[in-house]
Design a protein with these regions (language model features):
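Class I SAM-dependent methyltransferase Rossmann-like catalytic core
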Residues: 1-31
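Conserved class I S-adenosyl-L-methionine
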Residues: 35-44
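Class I SAM-dependent methyltransferase SAM/SAH-binding core
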Residues: 46-89
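Short amphipathic alpha-helix with an adjacent loop that forms part of the alpha/beta core around
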Residues: 89-96
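A conserved beta-strand element that flanks and buttresses the S-adenosyl-L-methionine
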Residues: 101
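A short, conserved alpha-helix within the catalytic core of class I
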Residues: 108-121
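Conserved catalytic/acceptor-binding region of the Class I
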Residues: 124-190
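C-terminal helical/coil "lid" or tail adjacent to the Rossmann-like core of SAM-dependent
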Residues: 189-235
Length: 250
């Protein structure tokens, strides 16, 4: 499980704009006066650190990923970096954390992996999981094949992604994470991307990536798939649903 740095850079402005303000404010309030040990899982190039570092003064960050190339870029934040196989060793990564963070990660995880991570989270620690895909998408104008294509994309999302045994939870990940952390104080808020013509490169990249995933399912014939892809590439607006979850100690 790894991502192209160019894709991460392309989505970064949309991610930054989408983060839900209430979980961030609650996290900042809880963290005030604490010198936190923060572990960011699946850190990529360090986007979560860049989003939160100013809100968590004095925190000691460890950025964790399995991809050495992404970690080399994440090191530019000045935080400690750690290369780790998250599929196998996530429990080790969070064992001494006061705060665990992740962005756009949990929809790639299996139910087993989420349960393991939740069980390993120290009782005193908090977890902030942002930008988890929730399956809701609105493209304008919409192509007639949109419902069938989106259903096929969701099926692809629920295939194995390498983060735990079995299929990824895809749009169901936040619900599973909330259930696994039900003994904590939870706040869940929507954090959708709201894309316009100004976001054309991201819209086009999404259209291409989703079309590739749908093609692997065989749900659409090639002609319909191409027409749907092109309609998405030319969309005037797109809203892509995500959820941000904050879990604070009970």
């Amino acid at each position: 499980m790894s991502f192209d740095p160019d894709w991460l850079a392309l989505r970064a402005p949309a991610d930054a704009a989408a983060r839900a303000p209430e979980p961030l404010a609650r996290l900042e309030e809880w963290a005030a006066g604490r010198r936190l040990r923060v572990v960011d899982l699946g850190c990529g190039t360090g986007a979560t650190h860049r989003a939160l570092a100013g809100r968590l003064p004095g925190a000691r960050w460890t950025l964790v990923d399995s991809d050495p190339d992404l970690l080399a870029l994440a090191a530019e934040t000045g935080a400690e970096i750690r290369r780790l196989d998250l599929a196998r060793d996530a429990e080790d990564a969070v064992a001494e954390a006061d705060l665990v963070t992740a962005s756009a990660l949990f929809d790639l995880a299996s139910g087993d992996w989420i349960a393991r991570l939740a069980a390993a989270l120290p009782p005193h620690a908090a977890l902030y999981a942002a930008l988890t895909y929730d399956g809701r998408e609105t493209w304008r104008p919409a192509h007639p094949a949109e419902p069938a294509a989106l259903a096929a994309f969701h099926a692809h999302q629920r295939g194995p992604k390498g983060l735990g045994d079995g299929p990824a939870l895809g749009p169901g990940a936040t619900a599973a994470l909330a259930a696994a952390l039900a003994d904590r104080r939870l706040l869940v808020a929507p954090s959708p991307w709201r894309l316009t013509a100004a976001d054309r490169p991201l819209i086009e990249a999404l259209a291409e990536g989703c079309a590739e995933a749908v093609s692997e399912t065989g749900a659409l014939d090639p002609e319909t798939l191409a027409e749907w892809r092109d309609a998405r590439r030319a969309a005037a607006t797109a809203e892509i649903g995500h959820l941000d979850l904050l879990a604070l100690p009970a």
